[in-house]
Amino acid sequence: LSQKFYTIDKVKLTMAGKRIVLTADRSLMTNYRGNFLYGFIACGPYEVLPEWVFDKVFCPPVETDPITGEAKVAQVGLRRVESALLQGYKRDEIMTVNPDYIEKSIGADTKIVGINVMDPLGMAPVTTTMSPEKLSYVAMKFKKLCANIIQLKKKYDFKVVVGGNGAWELAKSDRMKVHGIDTVVVGEADELALDLFHELETGNAPELMHCYVKNIQNIPEITAPTVNSLIEAMRGCGRGCDFCDVNKRSKKDLPVERLQREAKINLDYGFDSVWLHSDEMLLYGCDNRDFQPNYDAITTLWKGLKDLGANFVGTTHMTFSAVAADPKLIKDISEINDMHKSGRWISTNLGIETVAPDMVKKHLGIKAKPFSPDEWGWVVREGAQILNKNHWFPAATIIIGWPDETPDQVQYTIDMMRDFRAFNFRGLVAPLLYQDFSEKNSMHFGNLNEAQFTLFWKCWENNLRVINDIIPIILRNKTYGPPMKIFMYGLIKAGTWAIMRYLRGLCK
């Protein structure tokens, strides 16, 4: 009987709506079946992959309360904002919700809806490369979310604020109007979130805000589980690449003790691993100008998190230069993870961008440190082999179509791809078309010259070879039953064949 009354109370609260509702589009509200690389599927064209395959096979929704729509896990960025708001609002006034259930949480009492975005209009390099002149899944899902919110806004008259890594795409008045947005926040909202939400309620909030955290102590700790057990280990990078927005942030490391507290929230929820988000994890604790990794700081962090009961500790980003600078570090964190004994491979993202020495000097800042720009090609090759030897699966990027790039410079990277094939590199290389933040000099697929298209082809030739080689590893996913394994095998085979056929057609 008590359970019945509890359910009735939840329904009543839901009908009135929460004062503040936080959400993200459906391409972000998923655990990606424990594989972050599935997130790149959202960058692909909506018309190619049936929506039920996207929603059920690759990106099933996060666990959700079916009565209230509350998401049990959410992006770490949403959790940060949620924690910041809890410094001034009551717990029962705020809810982070699954976008598929958003109408359950919005009502007459709702004052603000906050949306976290990654690539809302499909303008990021991965999306423009994978979905040239087509509607991507990530853009379609955001469009669908906004359509629902606009209808609810007409009924309940609340404010809509958007922030996150992709907020810059919406920082124009016409785009805001079309999507029903009142305020866009570009940058880091940790310190200003509470004041901003008060201003939104009183109608005094600006249309556009640019903000960055000045004091690491002002970044609030998460209080609830995050997607795929991801926690934020550090911000910024310090490498200085001229095309990267992350370079605008100063490097900040979060203390081990704090990371342990946040990791424990996810492990207590039921996750069996910890993922560290960083734009350059191997610079954690780095205290020198040579960018030599701090072995003690990194191994202490890995051990401290593994000892909480995690099966392994992964990270979203490394750099080849840090890997090549300390091969023993990679070996030892792999041993901490028991990767050799278990046979487990862990993926991580790394940027190659180009290996042409002149381009490295001009565009990649000090990405090669502690090595020289002239050594960058060797650094990438050496780093790739070190990672593979220690069971790390690189998901690397290169940039094609720099405005000042010559065919001879492209050839350096083509030669690197041939070397990858020669030593049986196990990893993906995503060729991304150059994107200018002002959109003036952005490269379009139809403008690639012969050398650039050859490089594009070599990357996908590598990717399809590797994907076919690792099908058995993909099918080990513990969320797949026997029927799903058979379906996935057929889908991967058909998908790789279709991609190669498409590329061969472009060659002709």
Please place each PLM-identified region on the residue numbering.
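Catalytic cores of alpha/beta
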Residues: 171-179, 332, 404-419
